[in-house]
């Protein structure tokens, strides 16, 4: 074969491939991922909560599919969002510390979409994956700059940050800049309902006296007030979400856009953010995809934050990289039968860049969630529970004073103010959703405990986890 003929065939092949790609792009959906910040699953009306005001999210769920068992890969913003972006665990991609920038060699799904013709971006509250210096530390920023560690300006077409109000403006700017012949992906991040909580946030505030407190909340006036302020911030987010949906509709983009709403991790409430309990990692997840998702559906399949990346790639016709450990939920969206997950995992790491003063800023833990039971491994069990993001609030200081005065129930005093924590915890989520009864060591659940521990050990080994494995030392027979 002559060089001329070879070059001709290569050119024809390239043109055919390009035409096929362009044809596929025309049929590919836009992707809009809207993230609330620190938002636990019970706190949306459509999840059976009759006390919170979220009409836009409730309408959105009626038009799509609600996932009842979706979990963040971490109870902290940075690791959880890193898993969303990469389809991999925070440990596997070295993103267990709150301030870590995403490693240069780790691919994100927006980059893969961009390579296939998508216009991609992030907007609103910070996407959290370019690291932070913390306390204005110039040294850390200098290191980031010298080693070119902050990479998102190069990874995406559009990178903006700010609160949700700015984010809504940035959403419109993003759509204005998008080339007409390209589909888009945008991650739009809200600051709600992240602390701090304040009065007069919602158009119609929630009455603290009328709210039903979770079973693991002490019933005090200040606890009720704090909880009501949290609900108010969710209502404000709901208003903003409605505005975003209207922009999409007004621009004629709603019918070909897969819209996903998710909480990035659990709420900064008691036993929430920063913990591996349900309030820390069990998050709302709703998807709407006209013509592909039958309206009003509910799924009880286990969904991890790692699963969004492969789901989006498959929906857009892009190959899923082998390194992604997430499992695509595309078939679930389409209503096809699936085996589904038996287990998913979450990881707790350092929450700040500086030296810790307790478990709020530095804790290490892992957990495995099964269809019914959850097993938690607290590697730093010697440290007492400390709240993340609300240690200075009036309601927490009031609880401390009540505990010292002996005014808390023995159960709540033990949960929040014991000098240490259990190394291992096992909960029956079906019968004890508030995780108040630790079943570790019980004869009737010994087989479940052993199985979940084995599953977690295997995960940690495969991920090359840096934590000691949850195996007790036996002086006679070695490890057991």
Mark where each language-model region is:
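C-terminal helical cap and adjacent loop that interface with cofactors, partners, or active-site loops
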Residues: 430
């Amino acid at each position: 074969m002559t060089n001329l003929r070879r070059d001709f065939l290569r050119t024809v092949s390239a043109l055919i491939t390009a035409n096929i790609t362009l044809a596929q792009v025309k049929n590919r959906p836009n992707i809009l991922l809207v993230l609330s910040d620190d938002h636990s699953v019970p706190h949306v009306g459509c999840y059976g909560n009759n006390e919170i005001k979220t009409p836009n999210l409730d309408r959105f769920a009626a038009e799509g599919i609600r996932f009842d068992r979706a979990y963040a890969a971490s109870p902290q913003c940075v690791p959880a969002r890193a898993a969303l972006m990469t389809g991999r665990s925070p440990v596997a991609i070295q993103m267990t510390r709150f301030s870590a920038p995403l490693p240069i060699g780790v691919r994100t799904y927006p980059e893969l979409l961009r390579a296939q013709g998508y216009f991609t971006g992030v907007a609103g509250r910070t996407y959290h994956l370019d690291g932070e210096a913390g306390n204005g530390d110039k040294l850390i920023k200098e290191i980031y700059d010298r080693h070119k560690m902050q990479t998102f300006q190069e990874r995406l077409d559009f990178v903006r940050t700010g609160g949700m109000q700015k984010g809504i403006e940035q959403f419109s700017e993003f759509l204005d800049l998008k080339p007409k012949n390209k589909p888009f992906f945008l991650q739009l991040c809200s600051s709600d309902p992240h602390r701090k909580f304040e009065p007069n946030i919602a158009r119609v505030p929630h009455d603290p006296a009328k709210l039903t407190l979770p079973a693991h909340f002490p019933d005090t006036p200040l606890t009720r007030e704090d909880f009501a302020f949290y609900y108010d911030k969710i209502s404000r987010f709901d208003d903003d979400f409605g505005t975003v949906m209207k922009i999409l509709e007004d621009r004629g983009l709603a019918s070909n856009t897969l819209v996903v709403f998710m909480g990035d991790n659990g709420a900064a409430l008691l036993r929430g953010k920063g913990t591996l309990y349900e309030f820390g990692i069990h998050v709302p997840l709703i998807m709407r995809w006209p013509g592909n998702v039958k309206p009003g559906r509910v799924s009880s399949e286990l969904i991890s934050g790692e699963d969004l990346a492969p789901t989006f790639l498959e929906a857009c016709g892009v190959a899923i990289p082998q390194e992604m450990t997430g499992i695509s939920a595309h078939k679930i969206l389409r209503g096809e039968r699936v085996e589904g997950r038996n287990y998913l995992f979450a990881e707790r790491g350092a929450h700040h860049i500086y030296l810790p003063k307790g478990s709020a800023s530095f804790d290490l833990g892992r957990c495995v969630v099964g269809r019914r039971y959850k097993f938690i491994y607290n590697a730093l069990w010697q440290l007492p529970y400390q709240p993340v993001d609300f240690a200075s609030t009036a309601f927490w200081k009031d609880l401390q004073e009540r505990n010292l005065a002996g005014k808390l129930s023995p159960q709540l005093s033990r949960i929040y103010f014991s000098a240490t924590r259990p190394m291992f915890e096992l909960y029956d989520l079906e019968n004890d959703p508030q995780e108040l009864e630790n079943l570790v060591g019980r004869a009737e659940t010994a087989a479940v405990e052993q199985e979940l521990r084995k599953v977690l050990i295997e995960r940690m080994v495969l991920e090359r986890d840096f934590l000691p494995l949850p195996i007790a030392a036996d002086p006679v027979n070695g490890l057991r």
